[in-house]
Swiss-Prot record:
Pathway(s) of this molecule: Cofactor biosynthesis; tetrahydrofolate biosynthesis; 4-aminobenzoate from chorismate: step 1/2
The name this protein goes by in its record: Aminodeoxychorismate synthase component 2
Enzyme superclass (EC): transferase
Keyword Transferase annotated: yes
Species of provenance: Salmonella typhimurium (strain LT2 / SGSC1412 / ATCC 700720)
PANTHER family linked to this entry: MULTIFUNCTIONAL TRYPTOPHAN BIOSYNTHESIS PROTEIN, MULTIFUNCTIONAL TRYPTOPHAN BIOSYNTHESIS PROTEIN-RELATED
């Protein structure tokens, strides 16, 4: 079962639908409606931290979940979830040079993790005004995807099964969204 933590974003339900279409059992919980003890009782095999309209500091239990389950349960962070993952390990989340709300752009990737077997570059949909500051990304993460302007679009922990993508694979305008999420499920 996948636990999908909803950071009060409508795209959470697109993620839910995509994962269900891929055959996964998914339970959705709001970021302020569960505790670590509740998560332990649910016993998820994977955790997904959803997009959301806020900063990682305002994303309810998301940071605590990442810190507590890192290295124990595979996790994927999407947009805000990606930012929260980086921040949980010490990176700074800063204003992007250009706001990208509902815009598509090409993203180049290294073919690893969730990008395995996908063409590069990919056209993806972006909805964000914040990004992970590359100068502050800890060494425990590798950058797996980047925009034309070298903004971080994907990260992967070097030892643990943790990955984040800044863009929205669940958006209809993103290429290979199902395939990317399927790569996460296969682990």
């Amino acid at each position: 079962m996948i636990l999908l933590i909803d950071n009060y974003d409508s795209f959470t339900w697109n993620l839910y639908q995509y994962f269900c279409e891929l055959g996964a059992e998914v339970q959705v919980r709001r970021n302020d409606a569960l505790t670590l003890a509740h998560i332990d009782a649910l016993n998820p095999q994977k955790i997904v931290i959803s997009p959301g309209p806020c900063t990682p500091n305002d994303a309810g239990i998301s940071l605590a979940v990442i810190r507590h389950y890192a290295g124990r349960i595979p996790m994927l962070g999407v947009c805000l979830g990606h930012q929260a993952m980086a921040q949980a390990f010490g990176a700074s989340v800063v204003r992007a040079a250009k706001v990208m709300h509902g815009k598509t752009s090409p993203v180049t990737h290294n073919g690893q993790g969730v990008f395995r077997g996908l063409p590069s570059p990919l056209t993806v949909t972006r909805y964000h005004s914040l990004i992970v500051d590359p100068a502050t990304l800890p060494e425990c993460f590798e950058i797996t995807a980047w925009s034309e302007t070298q903004e971080i679009m994907g990260i992967r922990h070097r030892e643990w099964d943790l990955e984040g993508v800044q863009f929205h694979p669940e958006s209809i305008l993103s290429e290979q969204g199902h395939a990317l999420l399927k790569n996460f499920l296969r682990r």
